[in-house]
UniProtKB/Swiss-Prot annotation:
<feature type="compositionally biased region" description="Low complexity">
    <location>
        <begin position="20"/>
        <end position="39"/>
    </location>
</feature>
<feature type="compositionally biased region" description="Basic and acidic residues">
    <location>
        <begin position="51"/>
        <end position="65"/>
    </location>
</feature>
<feature type="region of interest" description="Disordered">
    <location>
        <begin position="1"/>
        <end position="847"/>
    </location>
</feature>
<dbReference type="GO" id="GO:0031012">
    <property type="term" value="C:extracellular matrix"/>
</dbReference>
<feature type="compositionally biased region" description="Low complexity">
    <location>
        <begin position="500"/>
        <end position="543"/>
    </location>
</feature>
<feature type="compositionally biased region" description="Low complexity">
    <location>
        <begin position="193"/>
        <end position="208"/>
    </location>
</feature>
<feature type="modified residue" description="Phosphoserine">
    <location>
        <position position="85"/>
    </location>
</feature>
<dbReference type="GO" id="GO:0030198">
    <property type="term" value="P:extracellular matrix organization"/>
</dbReference>
<feature type="modified residue" description="Phosphoserine">
    <location>
        <position position="501"/>
    </location>
</feature>
<keyword id="KW-0176">Collagen</keyword>
<keyword id="KW-0597">Phosphoprotein</keyword>
<feature type="compositionally biased region" description="Low complexity">
    <location>
        <begin position="628"/>
        <end position="638"/>
    </location>
</feature>
<keyword id="KW-0379">Hydroxylation</keyword>
<feature type="compositionally biased region" description="Pro residues">
    <location>
        <begin position="147"/>
        <end position="159"/>
    </location>
</feature>
<dbReference type="InterPro" id="IPR008160">
    <property type="entry name" value="Collagen"/>
</dbReference>
<dbReference type="GO" id="GO:0005581">
    <property type="term" value="C:collagen trimer"/>
</dbReference>
<feature type="compositionally biased region" description="Pro residues">
    <location>
        <begin position="731"/>
        <end position="746"/>
    </location>
</feature>
């Protein structure tokens, strides 16, 4: 049957996470920042000592020029949705920054090593093997990587893809084969032997011959018992039980019990062709919606400002507890659920499965004894459309893309990447006391901000004192969110017009209607084709023996292409992960091959032969080609020339003897009347339905609704002002946590120079999941997937059952008069008419 609409495009797997940016080659080892002591609670900010001379932090070695970006991961064939940016290891919780000990005097800001040129981010292919992360100076102990944030719960199932537009019902399958002709009633059992005729009366005893001289004739043979009533000739075999009238086609056995729908249960909705092999799981089965990025760990409590260093010099701020930036919870490793891979190409419309085997024809109603074919029972009602096949199975989600390879320890933030879609703005915590303006520690890398679905709003960390604003980390590009669920199915394509009916076959005698095949889904009624002009009536063909009607089954319902399984639940939005680099939106994979259209379900019972369609408008008088002027009817035998005007008495008006009307030239044989346009032969019972026309290509599946726009990713919390990035002085020993001081005034945001990016630290433990943030604004609309290939046209269905003969069209206009026949031979002279009043002398008649 024509293919059901293509299954909705698999939801394009979320774009693969950007491959880890080729890890930046290890930045040269920054001089090791002393390991940060565990960040004690931020002591109350000591009085901001003057910035002690920055102890010389070992000048961060110039970050080695960024090592070559790790080899660009091989570019996945399809641009995998960007592989996860290697999840920048979630910033390990910044080890609690040791209380800002007395900041060692920050060394003078060593010139920040120039940041090695940012390695060209490896093409975020699959994560290139990360270049080895340069050893990072020992960071304060990176908090252990939190367990991956809980994978965001899978979002609610995406809407089931819109059910593809209803494929046009395949053409009505050919009329089911007429049920087997009722079995010809077995010849009735031989009628009971006629009762033996009464034994013939014994022949009359021969009269005893007159007693001739002979002895009386022998007694006439006891009339041999009359022939044994011919043994009642075995009743003619019950006249062969004249096949009972085809049990008036036992009304088509109740449509063969509708063949019980032949249990051909709608052919298993041809298993919706395996959802076209769900195209390859989109490359990199993009990691499922990245498990919602574990909620961003609570913003590590910004280490309390170190206790004032002893010498009141504000100790270098303990490494600005890396702004505690709760490690972006380790982006929970992408929860399983590899996103549905790029929707596989909609499987190419699988070749429509072979028409589901017609379910076994319903049991033939017991064939009534075959009578003369009863009038065809009305065609069984079109069976209901079989239930839609079960939705095609949603192909297994592609495997989650690989998580970026080793999560490097967060390095200092690199240059701020492009701004990912803003995550939901975290609630701004109350400003912590402003710590002394320490030199900024090297900013950690922003974790890869993978745009999750806007995650739940993490609990706002308590913002530490606003440190000087560090340079922005690289803006993570958000991954293009998964394409929204397919919009509602486009409107069903226009119904193709029903083609003109084929020429009527010779009117076969209508075979007894077979049991109605299962009705196919009612084919969309084609528009009745314009009634062709009735052709000249063909001679009524002899009724052919009723051909068996072609099998009716309208093509069973096209197995619905499984309604797209419900999309996997869309994980609830995780907290906005840090916006990762926008994965390149993976190309929407080519639509997965449409699942093969399920095998057409068994033909539905043949629709009842629709009543005669309304009489098509009378076609223009079937001008068959003008019948060639009917062959001149044989020239009428030349009419005897009408009586040539009886030239006898000039007819009145001296029709010279009345000139027979000038012999009406033998009537020219009437121009062979253009036979009335032959009545249209009764439309033979429609010839067996040709194989269903190849279903026009299914109206293109309504355009895939453009994926609803994705909510824009929640706004990124506004980055707190960046503190100036001082060079990280060596961390002093963790001071004892002082009592939290009153929040100092927020220092002006200084802009520090961007420190070199350190290698990514190990991922910190995932912070607890913050409460869900408000849903972020919808993300940008995902790219519309490429239009899937047009499905194959369904196989041409068997010819529809012949339509009932159209009513006889009106006779065509008479053909033009045939040429005037030759003048008939002169008629015999008419009798002289009575002399009319001599009229004016007419023209002399022909000699």
């Amino acid at each position: 049957g024509p293919m059901g609409p293509s299954g909705p495009r698999g939801i394009p797997g979320p774009p693969g996470s950007p491959g880890p940016q080729g890890f930046q080659g290890p930045p040269g080892e920054p001089g090791e920042p002393g390991s940060s002591g565990p960040m004690g609670p931020r002591g109350p900010p000591g009085p901001p000592g003057k910035n002690g001379d920055d102890g010389e932090a070992g000048k961060p070695g110039r970050p080695g020029e960024r090592g070559p970006s790790g080899p660009q991961g091989p570019r996945p064939g399809m641009k995998g949705h960007r592989g996860f940016s290697g999840i920048d290891g979630a910033k390990g919780d910044a080890g609690p920054a040791g209380p800002k000990g007395e900041p060692g005097s920050p060394g003078e800001n060593g010139a920040p090593g120039q940041m090695g040129p940012r390695g060209i981010p490896g093409e975020r292919g699959r994560p290139g093997a990360s270049g080895p992360a340069g050893a990072r100076g020992n960071d304060g102990a990176t908090g252990a990587a939190g367990p991956p944030g809980p994978t965001g719960p899978a979002g609610p199932p995406g809407f089931p893809g819109a059910v593809g537009a209803k494929g046009e019902a395949g053409p009505q399958g050919a009329r089911g084969s007429e049920g087997p002709q009722g079995v010809r009633g077995e010849p009735g059992p031989p009628g009971p032997a006629g009762a033996a005729g009464p034994a013939g009366n014994p022949g009359a005893d021969g009269q005893p011959g007159a007693k001739g001289a002979g002895p009386s004739g022998p007694q006439g043979p006891s009339g041999a018992p009359g022939p044994k009533g011919n043994s009642g000739e075995p009743g003619a075999p019950g006249n062969k039980g004249e096949p009972g009238p085809t049990g008036i086609q036992g009304p088509p056995g109740p449509a063969g019990e509708e063949g019980k729908r032949g249990a051909g249960e709608p052919g298993p909705t041809g298993i919706p062709g395996p959802p076209g092999e769900r195209g390859f799981p989109g490359a990199d089965g993009v990691a499922g919606p990245k498990g919602s990025p574990g909620p961003a760990g609570p913003k590590g409590i910004t280490g309390s400002p170190g206790s004032p260093g002893p010498d009141g010099k504000t100790g270098p701020p303990g490494p600005a507890g890396q702004d505690g930036r709760g490690q972006a919870g380790v982006m929970g490793f992408p929860g399983p659920k590899g996103a549905a891979g790029e929707p596989g190409k909609a499987g190419e419309r699988g070749v429509p499965g072979p028409p589901g085997a017609a379910g076994p024809a319903g049991k033939d109603g017991e064939a009534g004894a075959q009578g003369p074919p009863g009038p065809a029972g009305p065609a069984g009602e079109r069976g209901e459309q079989g239930p839609a096949g079960s939705p095609g199975f949603q192909g297994p989600a592609g495997p989650p893309g690989e998580a970026g390879k080793d999560i490097g320890a967060p390095g200092p933030s690199g240059a701020r990447g492009e701004r990912g879609f803003p995550g939901e703005r975290g609630v701004q915590g109350p400003p912590g006391p402003a710590g002394p303006r320490g030199s900024n520690g090297a900013p950690g890398n922003d974790g890869a901000k993978i745009q999750g679905m806007p995650g739940e709003r993490g609990a706002a960390g308590i913002p530490g004192p606003k440190g000087d604003r560090g340079d922005s980390g690289p803006k993570g590009a958000g991954i293009t969110g998964p394409i929204g669920p397919p919009g509602p199915a486009g409107a069903t394509g226009d119904k193709g017009e029903t083609g003109p009916s084929g020429p009527a076959g010779p009117t076969g005698a209508r075979g007894p209607p077979g049991p109605a095949g299962f009705a196919g889904p009612p084919g969309a009624d084609g528009q009745p084709g314009a009634k062709g002009e009735p052709g000249d009536a063909g001679a009524k063909g002899d009724a052919g023996p009723p051909g068996p009607a072609g099998p009716t089954g309208a093509p069973g319902p096209i197995g619905n292409i499984g309604a797209p399984g419900p999309k996997g639940a869309r994980g609830s939005a995780g907290p906005p992960g840090a916006t990762g680099f926008p994965g390149a939106a993976g190309r929407v994979g080519p639509p997965g091959p449409s699942g093969n259209a399920g095998a057409p379900g068994p033909p539905g019972p043949a629709g009842k032969e629709g009543g005669k369609g309304p009489r098509g408008e009378t076609g223009p008088a079937g001008r068959g080609e003008k019948g060639s002027p009917g062959a001149d009817g044989p020239a009428g035998a030349p009419g005897t020339p009408g009586p040539q005007g009886i030239s006898g008495q000039r007819g009145v008006v001296g029709i010279p003897g009345q000139r027979g009307f000038p012999g009406i030239p033998g009537p020219s044989g009437e121009p062979g009347k253009q036979g009335p346009s032959g009545s249209s032969g009764e439309r033979g019972p429609p010839g067996p339905m040709g194989p269903p026309g190849i279903a026009g290509p299914p109206g293109e599946s309504g355009r895939e609704g453009s994926p609803g726009a994705e909510g824009s990713p929640g706004r990124d919390g506004s980055p707190g002002p960046k503190g100036d990035r001082g060079e990280t002085g060596p961390s002093g020993p963790p001071g004892a946590p002082g009592a939290p001081g009153a929040p100092g005034p927020v220092g002006p945001a200084g802009k520090g120079e961007t420190g070199p990016a350190g290698p990514a630290g190990p991922a910190g433990p995932a912070g607890a999941r913050g409460p869900s943030g408000p849903q972020g604004p919808r993300g940008d609309k995902g790219e519309t997937g490429e239009q899937g290939d047009r499905g194959f046209s369904g196989i041409q269905g068997p010819p529809g059952a012949p339509g009932s003969p159209g009513e006889q069209g009106p006779s065509g206009a008479s053909g033009p008069a045939g040429p005037r026949g030759p003048p008939g031979s002169a008629g015999s002279p008419g009798k002289d008419g009575i002399n009319g009043i001599p009229g004016p002398i007419g023209p002399p008649g022909p000699r």
